[in-house]
Amino acid sequence: MSNQIIRDHKRRLLVAKYELKRMHYKAICQDRNLPNKIRYEYFFKLSKLPRNSSKTRVRNRCIFTGRPRSVYKLFRISRIVFRELASKGSLIGINKSCW
């Protein structure tokens, strides 16, 4: 496994771990009915969470090659691997079209 795949997997685990806490803090920060002191306090708590626990830090990568671009979300594989597996018949329900 390449280092990028391992790093991305760790980020996904961190996102799952801190997801509820991050959503809670963000909701309090964005609530304008609360006093500013409380909002700033939770904004500070939000900034203390690990950076890699943010969803935007996760990169969709191919699970076979680690390729970061042109990855199908449904299969989590790149277009190149998808084409190889489809032509071999390894993907159930996917046929190479010919006309």
From Swiss-Prot:
GO MF annotation terms: structural constituent of ribosome
Transmembrane segments: none
Biological processes, Gene Ontology terms: translation
Presence of the UniProt keyword Ribonucleoprotein in the record: yes
GO cellular component assignments: mitochondrion; ribonucleoprotein complex; ribosome
Ribonucleoprotein is among the record's keywords: yes
Main location class: mitochondrion
Compartments it resides in: Mitochondrion
Domain of life: Eukaryota
InterPro entries: Ribosomal_uS14, Ribosomal_uS14_CS
UniProtKB keywords: Mitochondrion, Ribonucleoprotein, Ribosomal protein
Family designation: Belongs to the universal ribosomal protein uS14 family.
Name listed for the protein in its UniProt record: Small ribosomal subunit protein uS14m
